[in-house]
């Protein structure tokens, strides 16, 4: 049975380091295709904030509000442009050559939207793709090849418009040392995707990730709102839905969002954290 982390202390520093190595490996292998790829998901706060803003997460990981807990997964968002000229075929071929292959579920069947590395089996890559058509349902699987697919994620097309290049140095999965630029989801796109995820799935970590970015990105909620506002100005339905979700989930400190944050962090209610979570989200919403 898959070991799914539920609380902050389930995440280890070595998990994040492995994900960083995976980022470097994938970026090096797909370097000329990165204009159609964006790093999204739980690795974003650690790179966009902790790494890019030069926070020293190595010295103190005891405070999950000041140093992101990290992730075990590498989520790659694919633009619909990969469907042109069969770029998806080039992506899968290169990843296979570097040691990645489709994962298997508990029944032994391939999960073609999730791949793992032959030498680092704790690391998985989840492939996501923006909807090709507006009516395409989120969560559906878009098959690209017989052993390669991606989960349809509404709003990903918006996030792909605001990549933040992050220079990452370290050891790739093949053991080589390098420094390479990673296209990372911007704060506005990240909050949009996380807000939608809050409603779609019941993971407490989604609420924590959202709160962490609003609390720690540069000058805080107002700066994130500046990155998010263009989505609303163009009338993007996903952005409006994300706002509605945040208003509902973080209405006050007793709402489900703040409760989920404190439960993820400590396994119980914490009045201070819950008040902060509601306050930061409300400050973001007011700044819009």
Task: Explain the meaning of each model-derived region.
Residues 1-288:
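Compositionally biased terminal segments of proteins
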């Amino acid at each position: 049975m898959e070991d799914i982390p539920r609380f902050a202390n389930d995440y280890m520093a070595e998990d994040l380091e492995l994900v960083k190595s995976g980022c470097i490996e994938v970026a090096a292998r797909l370097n000329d295709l990165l204009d159609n790829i964006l790093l999204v998901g739980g690795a974003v706060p650690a790179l966009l904030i902790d790494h890019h803003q030069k926070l020293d997460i190595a010295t103190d990981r005891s405070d999950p509000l000041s140093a992101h807990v990290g992730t075990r997964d590498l989520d790659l968002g694919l633009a619909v442009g990969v469907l042109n000229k069969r770029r998806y075929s080039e992506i899968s071929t290169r990843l296979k050559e570097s040691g990645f292959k489709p994962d298997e579920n508990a029944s032994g069947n391939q999960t073609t939207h999730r791949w793992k590395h032959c030498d680092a089996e704790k690391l998985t890559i989840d492939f996501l793709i923006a909807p090709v058509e507006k009516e395409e349902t989120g969560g559906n699987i878009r098959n690209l090849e017989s052993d390669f697919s991606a989960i349809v994620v509404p709003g990903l097309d918006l996030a792909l418009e605001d990549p933040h290049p992050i220079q990452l140095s370290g050891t790739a999965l093949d053991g080589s040392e390098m420094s390479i630029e990673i296209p990372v989801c911007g704060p506005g796109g990240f909050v949009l995707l996380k807000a939608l995820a809050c409603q779609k799935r019941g993971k407490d970590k989604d609420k924590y990730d959202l709160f962490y970015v609003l609390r720690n990105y540069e000058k805080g909620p107002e700066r994130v709102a500046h990155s998010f506002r263009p989505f609303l100005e163009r009338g993007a339905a996903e952005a409006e839905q994300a706002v509605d979700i945040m208003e509902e989930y973080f209405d006050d400190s007793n709402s489900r969002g703040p409760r989920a944050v404190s439960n993820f962090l400590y396994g119980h209610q914490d009045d201070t954290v819950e008040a902060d979570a509601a306050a930061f989200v409300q400050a973001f919403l007011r700044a819009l």
